[in-house]
Amino acid sequence: MAHQTGIHATPELKEFFAKARNGSIRLIKVVIEEEQLVLGSHKELKHAWEQDYDALIVPLLDESQPCYILYRLDSQNAQGYEWIFLSWSPDHSPVRLKMLYAATRATVKKEFGGGHIKDEIFGTLKEDVALSGYKKHVSLCAAPAPLTAAERELQEIKINEVKTEISVESKQQTLQGLSFPLRPEAEEAILLLKQKKINYIQLRLDLEKETVDLVHTKHTEIKDLPGRIPQDTARYHFFLYKHSHEGDHLESVVFIYSMPGYKCSIKERMLYSSCKNRLLDSVEQDFQLEIAKKIEIEDGAELTDEFLYDEVHPKQHAFKQAFAKPKGPAGKRGQKRLIKGPGENGEDS
């Protein structure tokens, strides 16, 4: 879970939330001021939600200031109207603000009422949270629940008596292509790592909610890495490996998949193994984060400076050519001599 900041909504904002949830308010903008959540602005209903969406939301997005936006849909559930929760964290905003807003996001949802929120979007660019971005998000979320697919596959494995070992050493994945969505906190951490504003990310799978969650982004030196690896559960790690190679200073992102063998359940091992490739595809393609090396380990003790260096810069084994017979001295050479062994001329030894 994200670290909580102790910031809460003002009484005025709480009162406005209660009024807005089932009233004629289409949009609520919430900002942090003086360590409190306050009402930034609001907009009334004008047209159907799709018509209002871009016209009301986009003008409120400041290029250097994060904010939260709650946008009311026209659909309802048992608790009332359904809302979209947008977390806006532009690239040009200060890192301190980004982290503050990321850590307070859960509080905003709780104060408003999580049961009213149908969808949640995180964006750093306007196209991320525009109507087209929201529809793309809905389309991705409409895929079959990954965990259900996993359970079906697991059942098929049992029926067909497939007895393939599932472990860190096994390169064959029984489940192909499972994809748990990244939580907004995890997405923001990846963006910060790409900008080299943090140097370490630890992610976990929430097997019940079927999401990839952020564990923490504590500053990590190489000597700290072994202690970051849990001994009883799997994790995904991204580490900005700073080192020198052939006289150049390099900063290489290394992905580490830690799986402590059979201390984890079969289900956990299967899901971590199956979600790994889709997670990496997303990080490399959607976030354009270049990963220099992907490593799988069982024990954090493996993560030494020498180990990382050899993984990122594997030793090149030169091709061994057959020994070439040296050429003789230049100039006139004597006649060739044929040396025969004893008995080869028909003589006795």
Swiss-Prot record:
One of its GO terms (molecular function) is actin filament binding. Residues 321-349 are annotated as: Disordered. Gene3D superfamilies: Severin. Keywords: Actin-binding, Cytoplasm, Cytoskeleton, Repeat. It comes from the Eukaryota. GO terms for biological process: actin filament depolymerization; barbed-end actin filament capping; positive regulation of neuron projection development; regulation of lamellipodium assembly. Coiled coil: none annotated. It is found in: Cytoplasm, Cytoskeleton; Cytoplasm, Perinuclear region. One of its GO terms (cellular component) is myofibril. InterPro entries: ADF-H (IPR002108), ADF-H/Gelsolin-like_dom_sf (IPR029006), Twinfilin (IPR028458). PANTHER family: TWINFILIN, TWINFILIN-2. Actin-binding protein involved in motile and morphological processes. Inhibits actin polymerization, likely by sequestering G-actin. Belongs to the actin-binding proteins ADF family. Twinfilin subfamily. This is Twinfilin-2-A. It comes from Xenopus laevis.
